[in-house]
């Protein structure tokens, strides 16, 4: 199938984080939501959708899947679209993410598991009812509602940043685990290679909101539960950084690089209502109308606008990827009036070879 909007991904391998099934307290789970396709954008129904996985999975009506998808993204270089250099003002963030990131090193064994480490740069997600944590999971896939001994307590970071903590030894069944480890009632790093809890991404993308309502963009808790609970809220007329994962040095899933995935709710949906595991037909969370992808590898930033197979309805805004002043973006990518650029339903990806680009909501 000819995909005029398809871009070269230069033989890199990448896994696009996808949300796991919703789980209750102390419930073991092995299922994952779909991470789709290889070489071409293919969804569970065989339609071309998004570059992410080398094993297609079939999604049930409730958004669960029956198998775990691995991922190798290899897009043909012959499908690269024309290079564009677009002028677009890069708005400054409405709030400084660095102010909440925290500059102090995390000290093992000094903070109780019952206390959320807000002063260390982690962002508390109070609406989830987990004491501020994004998820709480042990190596066997059991979950809990409070951070306790033997569990990994995963957390969110400010927009533009990603967590640094996950154990090098991961479950053999394809699940991912991340966060601080609770032992003897105290929190410990699960990745002792770094003393900080959050790391800045590549800094090559922002979300720019030109519509009248706030937009809750919800990143997946990855490695971890993979639920879409990590918030980036972009107020009307403002902008926020998008965390572009530095794939070459970040978490790898079974030896494959991973990028970031964001579920975008309709404008006007609050973060408390939108950055959750949604229910069928709700239009929020994993049922949000559009998904974004972002990753940086081998000197190139890749940005995507992706259909959500759970929700075929168009959002109450349009979206396009636009180069910032002086930047170079290969390809064109937009979702306007319910139609993606290119074939109309496949989603689209651009490569930023220099500078940065904006996801513009209008």
Curated annotation (Swiss-Prot):
Q: How does it sit in the membrane?
A: Peripheral membrane protein
GO molecular function terms attached to this record: hydrolase activity, acting on glycosyl bonds
Q: Name one GO biological process term.
A: division septum assembly
Compartments in which it is found:
Mitochondrion outer membrane; Secreted, Cell wall
**Group of enzyme by EC:** hydrolase
E.C. number, please? 3.2.1.-
Query: Would you identify the family this protein belongs to, as annotated?
Result: Belongs to the SUN family.
Function, as annotated: Involved in aging, oxidative stress response, and in the regulation of mitochondrial biogenesis. Inactivation of UTH1 increases life span, leads to higher resistance to heat stress and to hydrogen peroxide, and increases sensitivity to the superoxide radical-generating drug paraquat and to copper. Also required for the selective autophagic degradation of mitochondria (mitophagy) in response to nitrogen starvation. May play a role in cell wall morphogenesis and septation.
Q: What is this protein called?
A: Probable secreted beta-glucosidase UTH1
């Amino acid at each position: 199938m000819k995909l005029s909007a398809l871009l070269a991904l230069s033989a890199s391998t990448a896994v696009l984080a996808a949300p796991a099934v919703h789980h209750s307290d102390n419930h073991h789970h092995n299922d994952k939501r779909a991470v789709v396709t290889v070489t071409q954008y293919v969804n569970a129904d065989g339609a071309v959708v998004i570059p992410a996985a080398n094993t297609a999975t079939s999604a049930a009506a409730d958004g669960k899947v029956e198998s775990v998808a691995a991922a190798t993204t290899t897009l043909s270089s012959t499908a690269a679209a024309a290079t564009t250099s677009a002028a677009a003002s890069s708005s400054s963030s409405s709030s400084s993410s660095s102010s909440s990131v925290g500059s102090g090193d995390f000290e093992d064994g000094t903070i109780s598991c019952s206390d959320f480490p807000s002063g260390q740069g982690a962002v508390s997600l109070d609406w989830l009812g987990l004491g501020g944590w994004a998820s709480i999971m042990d190596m066997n896939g059991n979950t809990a509602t409070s951070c306790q001994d033997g569990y990994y307590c995963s957390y969110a970071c400010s927009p533009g940043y990603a967590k640094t903590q996950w154990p090098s030894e991961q479950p053999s069944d394809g699940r991912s685990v991340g966060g601080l480890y609770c032992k003897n009632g105290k929190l410990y790093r699960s990745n002792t290679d770094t003393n900080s809890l959050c790391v800045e991404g590549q800094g090559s993308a922002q979300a720019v909101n030109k519509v009248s309502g706030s937009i809750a963009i919800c990143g997946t808790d990855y490695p971890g539960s993979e639920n879409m609970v990590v918030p980036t809220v972009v107020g009307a007329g403002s902008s926020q950084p998008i965390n572009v994962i530095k794939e070459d040095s970040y978490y790898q899933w079974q030896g494959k690089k991973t990028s970031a995935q964001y579920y975008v709710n309709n404008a006007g949906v609050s973060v408390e209502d939108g950055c959750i595991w949604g229910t069928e037909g709700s239009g929020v969370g994993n049922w949000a109308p559009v998904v974004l992808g972002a990753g940086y590898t081998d000197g190139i930033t890749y940005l995507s606008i992706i259909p959500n197979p759970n929700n075929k309805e168009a959002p109450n805004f349009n979206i396009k990827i636009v180069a910032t002043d002086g930047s170079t973006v290969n390809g064109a990518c937009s979702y306007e009036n319910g139609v993606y650029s290119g074939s109309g339903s496949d989603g689209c990806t651009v490569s930023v070879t220099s500078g940065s680009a904006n996801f513009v909501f209008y």
